[in-house]
Amino acid sequence: MADQDQTNQQAGSDAPSFNLQRVYLKDLSLEMPNAPHVFLEQEAPQVEVSINVGGQRLAETVFESTVTVTVTTRVNDKVLYLVEGTQAGIFELANIPAEQMDPLLGIVCPTMLYPYLRANVADAITRTSLPALHLAEVNFQALYEQRLAEMAQQQPDAANGNDSGIILPPGATRQ
């Protein structure tokens, strides 16, 4: 009976697990370089948004995933405000097959973090007394696939049959 319990525990320890351990605001900055003059502007602002996903391994099964957004709003070529924020999370990924790690870190983790980042950015902008800006939903799977396509285009060696798996930096050549 004790042997069966030990076998069940060992089998359970080999089971794949994906756990969110912590979500935190890693960085948030807001600049209004042309205040208070921008409050007098009557024209509609132009909004530029860029999003980036990153991450790093913290321990064997522990990873930090980040989503960074930069929002630049201009009126008549003057910056109304600039908001930069990074939302981060610590995730434990144990016994996950290698081919599933990158999609989990590049799609699932950012998808979980993004709502927190949206709320933090919206709150920061609201505190400027300007109209709120609510960031649109992001399809992180499409961004991930786009990144893979860009990497494939930068990898002419892979298309020529060199499947070493080594990703070269731009401009580097294989010896």
Curated annotation (Swiss-Prot):
Gene: secB
Main location: cytoplasm
Subcellular location field: Cytoplasm
InterPro entries linked to this entry: SecB, SecB-like_sf
Function according to Swiss-Prot or TrEMBL: One of the proteins required for the normal export of preproteins out of the cell cytoplasm. It is a molecular chaperone that binds to a subset of precursor proteins, maintaining them in a translocation-competent state. It also specifically binds to its receptor SecA.
Any Gene Ontology CC annotation: cytoplasm
PANTHER family in the record: PROTEIN-EXPORT PROTEIN SECB, PTHR36918
Keywords of the record: Chaperone, Cytoplasm, Protein transport, Translocation, Transport
Polar residues composition-biased segments: 153-163
GO MF entries: unfolded protein binding
SUPFAM superfamilies on file: SecB-like (SSF54611)
One biological process term in Gene Ontology: protein tetramerization
Protein name: Protein-export protein SecB
Region of interest called Disordered, as start-end residue ranges on this chain: 153-175
Subunit field text: Homotetramer, a dimer of dimers. One homotetramer interacts with 1 SecA dimer.
The family this protein is said to belong to: Belongs to the SecB family.
